[in-house]
Design a protein with these regions (language model features):
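Well-ordered alpha-helical scaffold segments within catalytic/enzyme domains
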Residues: 47, 51-52, 90, 127, ...
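Surface-exposed helix-capping loop/turn segments at secondary-structure junctions
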Residues: 53-62, 132-141, 178-184
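Acidic/histidine-rich alpha-helical segments that form the ligand environment
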Residues: 109-145, 154-167
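Bacterial N-terminal signal peptides
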Residues: 9-20
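Short N-terminal segments immediately surrounding and downstream of signal-peptide cleavage
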Residues: 24-46
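Acidic/histidine-rich, surface-exposed loop or edge segments in extracytoplasmic proteins
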Residues: 26-33, 96-110
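Positively charged n-region of N-terminal signal peptides that target proteins for export
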Residues: 1-4
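Short, contiguous alpha-helical
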Residues: 38, 42-49, 61-105, 146-189
Length: 189
């Protein structure tokens, strides 16, 4: 019985210490919704952009071909698509039209070189950061028009698209890189 009580007392003291630490950390690190959402964009940007930079320009037209891959986007098309969605979602959050050509989620046909594609991508992340910076506790859950379908959504819901959509395509791009003998930068030691 004494051992059981000692274990419970130790456990209680440990939990109390951990919860106090967590509370003081939470108070010191309290962030706004906008800051949290911006952190998500920074995370995907920090992996996506280096992956886009890692592929040599002569491989930007690469798409898997062994198996049933008809209609799969090339490496360059993956990047332009993510950038276009960043602009589309950012514009919806801001309540405006995209400031650049998004070409039905494909990105502009005129953007072809690696340098131009990377510029389009990086500027789309700047626009995404600008969009989430306008999100406040007051407008976070306010119903707004969404660019995908006819229903209403929220700025919070749309802001999550930057991360999950970017990482969805990052996963595909990581495979493309590896199929070309390139270790994605985020996987390097």
């Amino acid at each position: 019985m004494k051992k059981t009580i000692a274990v419970f007392v130790s456990l209680f003291v440990s939990l109390l210490a951990m919860s106090s630490f967590g509370v003081s950390q939470a108070v010191a690190e309290k962030k706004t919704a906008s800051q949290v959402l911006d952190g998500g964009i920074k995370t995907v940007e920090g992996e996506f952009v280096p992956a886009a930079e890692a592929m040599p320009e002569d491989k930007y037209d690469f798409a898997p071909s062994n198996g049933d891959f008809k209609g799969v986007r090339t490496f360059a098309q993956q990047i332009k698509h993510v950038a276009a969605i960043n602009y589309i979602v950012g514009a919806a959050i801001l309540g405006e039209k995209p400031p650049v050509d998004v070409n039905e989620e494909k990105g502009p046909d005129s953007v072809k070189s690696k340098a131009d594609i990377l510029k389009y991508l990086k500027e789309s992340f700047v626009y995404a950061h600008k969009a989430v910076a306008t999100i406040t506790e007051a407008n976070l859950l306010e119903p707004i028009a969404v660019p995908f379908g006819k229903e209403k959504g929220t700025r919070l819901g749309l802001a999550t698209v930057f991360a999950w959509h970017g990482f969805d395509h990052y996963g595909q791009m990581a495979v493309y890189l590896r199929m070309n003998g390139i270790v994605p930068p985020a996987s390097r030691n």
